[in-house]
Amino acid sequence: MEKASLNIAQTKEIPLTDRRMGLRGWKACSRPHLLGRILLFMSILFITSAELSSDVSSREVYMPIFNNKLSFKVPPIKRSLLLGAALYEDFEYSSNNSASDGAFCTVFNAGMNDASREVVFEIHVMDVLQEETDSSRFGGTSHERGRQSLGFSVFNNKNGDLLRSKKNLASGTSVIEVNPGNCNEFLICFINLVYDGSWSSIDTEKSVTIKMTYNDKLDPDMLLHLVNQMTPQVVKALNTVSDGLFQIVSDTTLLQMESDRRDINEATYSYLIVGFVSLMVAQLISNIIVTTYLIIKIKSNPSSHIKKKGL
């Protein structure tokens, strides 16, 4: 009986040992899978936090050079930090694609056979904060306070001739026309200058998208742009101005008004000289009259003490 119970106990003990060994083996095998899951979870958290902590400018999509279009950002530069006596607002051509310190330059190849065709640059500018900032905290950004400007210049990349330049390029869409002459390669430069050196200055980056085209290709796009911009308020203002101009022209008073104003402007100096000379003559005559009157008065009425002495 005791042997039988011992055998039963042994037979029951063997499966228990097997189960423990199997559990240990399962734990050992599951450790790599658990470690991989932890690493995957940490990588997902890292990517999510990186996306959430990105600033405003990183949310923009910047296109490569395709179809003569290029998008980029121009960082702000303090004007006071630019050393030297040179006027950094005025670009100077340089063969290494750098117009001046702090400028961003790029080269556009027109790729046209007829060099006399007019080239048109369509530029879209947008102000972008460098970080999540309350721009109204110190009274607005430097651009809103008129202390920041974007400069733009186009050079002939072969000989360095300045073809077109514009200071304080406005935000929004601007269309700039250039007569290239014999040039088919352009050096285009931007510089984002800030004239406010105070600690409360909130500077903005300039998000620039530039597209190069020709007049014949741009005409349909320009027509659509004008149609979209032709609001009822603009139409009313244009009608008011045109009615006033046509009324002046129809009354033939515009030329007469211009002639009268021109005569007044030309006669101003003569009137001034005549008036000054007349004033001096009047003052001299008045002095002579007063002096003569005093002399006559003194001679006609001698002093009383002179009469008493019998003189």
Curated annotation (Swiss-Prot):
Keywords for the protein's UniProt record, in alphabetical order: Membrane, Transcription, Transcription regulation, Transmembrane, Transmembrane helix
Statement: the UniProt record of this protein carries the keyword Ion transport: no
Protein name: Regulator of rDNA transcription protein 6
Spans through the membrane: 32-52, 271-291
Topology of the protein relative to the lipid bilayer: Multi-pass membrane protein
Recorded name of the encoding gene: RRT6
GO cellular component: membrane
Species the sequence originates in: Saccharomyces cerevisiae (strain ATCC 204508 / S288c) (Baker's yeast)
Compartment annotation: Membrane
Function: May be involved in the modulation of rDNA transcription.
